[in-house]
Structures are given as C-alpha cells and as structure tokens.
C-alpha cells in the first residue's frame, strides 16, 4: 500500500511541475510602464501585375500520307511447280487372267513297280519334266495366256500298289535256331543237387590265424636324410643387363587444336524497318485559364502586431 501511495504522489508532483512551467515563464513582473512601440504606417503597394507563363505553341506536324507498308502487286497466276498433268489411266502391271490351271497339284505318290521299272527313273523322253516350250514374244511383265497344261503332272502310270514290297520268304523274326541238346534253364540230374556244396571240413568261419606281431599301421617317422647343401633358390648371376630399363618413351606432342578458321562474328540481319503506324496528331488544347491570385493585404499592414502587451 505504501509503495502505491508513493507512486501516486510522484505522478501528481510531476503533473503539477509540467503544467506550471509555461505559465510561470510567461509571467513577467511589470515594475514600470512601457508605451506601445511606434511603427510607421504601411506604405501602399499595388498588387503585382499577373503575367501568365509563356507556353510555346506546339509544333504542328502535318499528318503523313497513307502508304500501305510493303505491299507488292499480286503476281500473275502461274501453275504450281512440279506438277505433272494427270497421266492417262493405265492399270499398273496388270496381267491378263490366265486360263484355269490347278495351282501346283502334284500327282499321287505312287512308285512304279520294282519289277520292270526301277525307282527314280525319269519319265520318257517325249515329256521332259519341268520343261516348258519356249514361249512366243511376250512384252515385259505380261504373260500371255498359256495353253492348258497341267503343271507338273506326270502321266498316270499303271496300277501299282503304293509302297508295297513283294512278300519275302518266311523267316521267323529274331528266332535263334534250337541249340543242341541243352535244355535252357534245366536243373542238373539228381545226383548233383543244385547249389549244394559238400560239407567242408571244420573251419572256424572267418577266422584268420593270428598274425605275427606287427605294430598296427605304424609308419616310420618321417625322417628325411640330410640334404646336401644347396644354396636356397639362388639364381646364377645373369649377364650384364640393365635391370628393367625401358627405352625412353616417345611422347607425342601435346594436343594442339588447329587454328580456327576465321568466321566473322554472327551478326543479326538488320531488322525490317516498318513505317510507324498512322498516329493522329494530338489535338491542341490551350492551357486551362488560371485566375490570377487576388492580393489580400494583411489587416495590420506588412508586419504582424507585436506580442508585447
């Protein structure tokens, strides 16, 4: 509570000091009478004559005559280049329809009889296989309608059973002749019973006689005889050869670029100068009329009244 009271008292004192300082500064004690200062009456000066500022008249440019920019006369009509007249109608590479021919029909696979015609015999001479007579003059890429000839057809041979061999003599397939008097898989006579051995003498089964004493699988110690003195891996001195001396390598000259061919710096072509678009000249507008400032003399002349009262 005391701190709050002290704080409020300090604020009040500061406010009183701030408010009273300008009042005390203006208060001056008057010990004697000071008459008011005598001033000369103000001389009348007429107001200055208003001169409007001089504006130069705008330069008048006559409107340019209209010229269409870079218009060429239309050229005379010329047919487009590289155009050939339409050729007459010709069916490209059309062959006449041939007569009916059975396409690639082979005769039935019938072999001639092996008796009087051995296989792989050529047909008679009057029909050479696969030989066509020399045709008459034919234009290129056009074949005349040939006469009807069945392509690749042999004359019908006599009746031959296809792929039939004559019946061979009777031979039982894969039969061995009967062997001599030894019936297979026959047991021997009774006086020798099969797989019966006579009773052997008494022998202990699988018993070996006691061998002489031998140390079981003992190897002698690996003792090598003392080797003769040999210098370990010493090579004889080679003949005088410079050890691993390579010939001085031939260094190629450093890569040098060839002098570049002089090329003038790339210069852009001068831009096409187009005429400026038609612009209307600006309409002359006179400057707005400004009223001259009215001179109002101060009510107390040139100088303001003194503040000394």
From Swiss-Prot:
Transmembrane segments: none
InterPro entries: Proline-rich_CW_protein (IPR051308)
Keyword Repeat included in the entry's annotation: yes
GO biological process assignments: nodulation
Keywords: Nodulation, Repeat, Signal
Disulphide bonds in the chain: none
Protein name, per record: Early nodulin-75
Gene name linked to the record: ENOD2A
